[in-house]
Curated annotation (Swiss-Prot):
Signal sequence range: none
Superkingdom as given in the UniProt entry: Bacteria
InterPro entries for the chain: Smg (IPR007456)
Organism of this sequence: Escherichia coli O6:H1 (strain CFT073 / ATCC 700928 / UPEC)
HAMAP family attached to this UniProt entry: Smg (MF_00598)
NCBIfam families assigned: PRK03430.1
Official protein name in the record: Protein Smg
Similarity comment: family membership: Belongs to the Smg family.
Length: 157
């Protein structure tokens, strides 16, 4: 499922391709690209739930809003988000790329993924997807994109 999300993000969203694609055509394109129907369905459902945030149909869990409070992760969250992932989320909060609300959206979307393996690079892409879909997060998206590609470009040299 995560592979489908990455493909969709890179092919349609990140490249600013036509965003209004017929769902049947999209499913057929993904099938033609070699993705499993169940993974396609799950990825589209995942994106639909993300769109609910954008449309105000869903809100992230509201936790303490005191900026000095510390987020305590549940065992399920710790299982999916290792120490490097949790540290990266904290770092992004400290440099104000994400706020308490977007952090909770990211965590909720990460937990909704049906993938056995999840690492820091995967988290960065989920954060990009969430920020892209939330109105008013354009600057945060830009900062996150710069962080993601700056680090990856540095690895190539």
């Amino acid at each position: 499922m995560f592979d489908v999300l990455m493909y969709l993000f890179e092919t349609y969203i990140h490249t600013e391709a036509e965003l209004r694609v017929d769902q049947d055509k999209l499913e057929q394109d993904l099938t033609d690209a070699g993705f499993d129907r169940e993974d396609i369905y799950n990825a589209l459902l995942w994106l639909e739930k993300l769109a609910d945030y954008q449309e105000g149909l869903a809100e992230p869990m509201q936790l303490a809003s005191d900026p000095l409070s510390m987020r305590i992760y549940t065992p399920e969250e710790c299982e999916r988000l290792d120490a490097s992932c949790r540290g990266f989320l904290l770092f992004l909060e400290q440099i104000q790329v994400i706020n308490l609300e977007t952090r909770e959206m990211v965590i909720e979307r990460v937990l909704a993924l049906d993938t056995a393996e999840f690492d820091l690079e995967d988290l960065k892409w989920v954060i990009l997807m969430v920020l892209f879909n939330i109105p008013g997060c354009e600057n945060a998206y830009q900062q996150m994109e710069e962080l993601l590609f700056e680090v990856n470009e540095g690895m190539l040299h």
